[in-house]
From Swiss-Prot:
Belongs to the activator 1 small subunits family. RfcL subfamily. NCBIfam families: PRK04195.1-5 (NF003229). Keywords: ATP-binding, DNA replication, Nucleotide-binding. It comes from Pyrobaculum aerophilum (strain ATCC 51768 / DSM 7523 / JCM 9630 / CIP 104966 / NBRC 100827 / IM2). This is Replication factor C large subunit.
Amino acid sequence: MALPWIEKYRPKSFAEIVNQEEAKYTLASWICLKFRAPKEFCTRWAKKRDKEVAEAKAILLAGPPGVGKTTLVHALAREIRYELIELNASDVRTADRLRQVIGRGLRESSLFGFEGKMVLFDEVDGLHVKEDKGGLEEIIEIIETAKIPIIMTANNPYDPKFRPLRDISLVVNLKRLSEEEVVEVLRRICTSEGAKCEEEALRSIAKSSMGDLRAAINDLQMYLSGGRRILTLDDIKRVGERNPQLSMFEILDRVYKARWFDEARAVSFNPSFDWEQYFIWALESIPVVYKDLEIASTAYDRLSKADVFMGRIKRTQEWELLPYALELALGGVSQIKGKPRLPPFIKYGFPQRLLLLAKSKEARRRRDALVEYLAQNLHASKSVIKSEIIYVLSALSKNNQSIIEKLSKALGINAIDIKSVL
């Protein structure tokens, strides 16, 4: 079986990694200031002496998929001859499992003459704080006590739940690669594979990859599969281009920074576009983007009209109205007369509404369990339970604690939690 090209052409050294000089300098400086590393490596790459670099307890590499976060750590370990203990935080989630894997890795002796050990927590934003039984807290504990380099990667480390991790780490942002930089890498691979690739074909792959070099290399290998050694633009069009997944931050950025109406409208064609999520995020991002009250008011007016359309669609199933709703919500919010030139970087905040829903999730789960139990045993509808029975039980339980105790036993929920629901 052929080796995947993303592995075959993975950079082996710092010098081979494309256009991430700032990240390389910061990471190398941190290693050289706090740990043992070859003198020649430090002389070439350790360019920073900042206080925040020297005081960081760990490094958190942040950036979109395919920009080289994991590759950068592998190259670092190879350059300084450290054994890399790599864990994917999406797979090794619990505190017990983390302690088991890390503990074993640190206890075992290094083979092949390694100079030391370092730990990589890959995709740390894959952890779910509530569900993953202390995984995040254990990572923080490991960072606080470790005597070896701890490096993490994340696509989006700015979720509020990861603030404790950011507080003890230095966040190093990796840039999305430009179309030209991706094309240059693809060109080198074509030459190495003995394939004749049209420039327009390579540019089409690079453009659809949106700076994700890993995706671009995978696409190139797919187009040249089966022993093919010629790639044209017609081949790309015949097979079809990649439609990349976008985060909500990227969706908002594309909408607000669209240069014309159709460009903003086209965001809805992306498979990751979700109207409900977009509406919630847009509601809170409009005043962040548009400081002018009149422009912000116009944006809110168009978004509210789009919501009216969506409400009617849900009630009547008149899906022929959907284009009008999307044009108002996307193009209407983006293309406003007098709209100012927007800065390159806009700090979109995570919606407070979603944060409040997340915080109340457990309370709502307990309430739903209670309503379900009462509906089955009293042979009443859930709406009646919510609007009448709950209030009756609440009044009765104030003078009769046995009601709460019986419900607690029946549902397997702590009596204090039952009381909080009532």
